[in-house]
Amino acid sequence: MTTAPATAGRERRTSDVVVIGAGPAGLMAARTAKAQGLSVTVLEARRRVGGRTWNGLVEGADGKDHFIEIGGQWISPDQTRLISLVEELGLPTFSRFRDGRNVYVDPRGERHVYDGLDFPVAEKTDREMDRLIAKIDELTAEIDAAAPWEHPRAAELDKISFRHWLEQESDDPEAIDNVSIYIASGMLTKPSHTFSLLQALLMSASAGSFRNLVDEDFILDKRVEGGMQSVSLAMAAELGDDVVLGQPVRTLRWAEPDPSTADEKNGVAADVRNGVAHDGAAGDVVALTDDYEVHARYAVLAVPPNLYSRISFEPPMPREQQIAHQHISMGLVIKVHAVYETPFWREEGLSGTCFGGGRLVQEIYDNTNRGENLAGGAPGKEDPHGTLVGFVSDVYAEQMWALPEEERKAAILGAMAEYLGPRTLEPIAFFLSDMAAEEWTRGAYATSYDLGGLSRWGHLQNRPTGPIHYACSDIAAEGYQHVDGAIRMGEAAGLAIAEREATDAGQPTG
C-alpha cells in the first residue's frame, strides 16, 4: 500500500481499472480484476483500508489499550461468499458468546430474564408478533432481492411506511415496536415511519427471511479474530502498491459530452443529460486526486451512494442518476463499546443478549474479544476482560449527540444498566463509534431509499453508467448492508469488467 504525501504536481498512473474506495467492495473488485489479468489502481480517501469495517483501540482506566471493532463485525451462516473469502485468506473466526439467559425490558421499564428467542411478553402480544412476522415473510417470499422494483405491487408497497403498515395490521404497540426493531433500529437505523414497506421487505429478502433477522444467533453468529477489517487488510496486502491511501478522488472524467445538449444562448455547456450507453464498456476515464492522475478504461465506484456527490463528474452524470442519488441516504446509529474487568454478567448466568423495543439502547450483546488483535490478544485465547456492545439508533442517536460528553455517557450506561444492573455503570473503558462524523462515511450502517424511491430509482443502482461500474453493500441483493454484500458486489464488478474485456477481445474469461 502507498500513502501519498502532498505534492505540488500530480503523479500519472495508467491502469486498466481505477477503483474508487478501498473498503471490502473496492478491494474485492480490484482483487478479482487483477486475477483476470487486468491492471488496477485503488484510490482511497482515508489513510486506512476497510471502509465501514475498522479495527480500533480504546484506552482504559487501567492504562491499557483494549481492542474494539469500531465498524461492522458479524458473519451469519448465509453469508457464504464472505465465509469462503475469510477461509481463503486464512483468518480464524469464533462464535459470539450466547450461553445463559437473555434480558428483555418491556415498555413499562420492567426487566424480564428469559430463555430462547421469544420475548417474554403477554400471550396476546406474542401471538401478534408471530402473526406479523408470518405476514412479513409471506410478502418477503414474493420479493426478488435483486430486483424488488419488479414486484407487481412495488409502487404500492413503496408508498406506505413500514410503521404505518404495521399499525394498519395491528393495534398492539408492544408487538409493533418489537417487530420494528429488527428492520428500523436494528438494520436501516432510521425511524420506521421514514422508509417503505418495500424497503423493509428487501432487507428481509436479502437475509433469506424476516425470521432470520429475528434470530440473533443466526444474524450475529461469528466474528473474525482480530476484527473484520482484517479481511480488507489481507486483500490490500495482496494488492500492495496498487492501493493508494489518503487520496480522495476530486474529479472523475468519464465521457465525451453530447454537443446537441449545449445551449450557447443560455450559457449551458454540452453534457450527457440524456444518458449514455449503459453497457459497462471501456472508455477513457481519468480520476484526479490531489496527488494522482489515474488514466483507465474502466472505473469502479466502490463507495456508498451518499458519497457519490463528493466527486465532481465531468461531464455530470445523466439526469436520472443525479435525481436517483438524491433519494438515498445513510442511517444513524451509535455503536457503544463498554469494557469491564470481567464479563460479570456471565457470573449471573446471563448471555449479555438484551432487547427493549423503543428504548434508548434497544440491543446489547456480549462482544468479548478472542485471538490476536491490536491490543496484543493471544491466538485462540479469549480476552479476560468482558466487552459489551450496545446500539443507540436513529432519533435516540440524535438526542445523545446533542448532550455534553459526560451526560451522554451517563445516559447510555444508565440505559444499559436497566438490563444488566449497576455493575454496567462502571466500565474500565468506554467508546462510541461515530460513523456519522467520519468525512468519508457520514452515517451507518448503510444507505436506503426514502418513501417511494426504491420502486422509482432502484433499477439504476447496479446498472453501469458508461465505463463506470458500481460496487458496495448498499446496492447488494444477498448480503444487503453487510460485508458479504460488499464482497459479492465487488466480485461482480470485477468479473463484469473482465468478461467485457474478453468479449471485446473475442476470448473466454478464466
Spans of model-derived segments:
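FAD-dinucleotide binding site
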Residues: 1-510
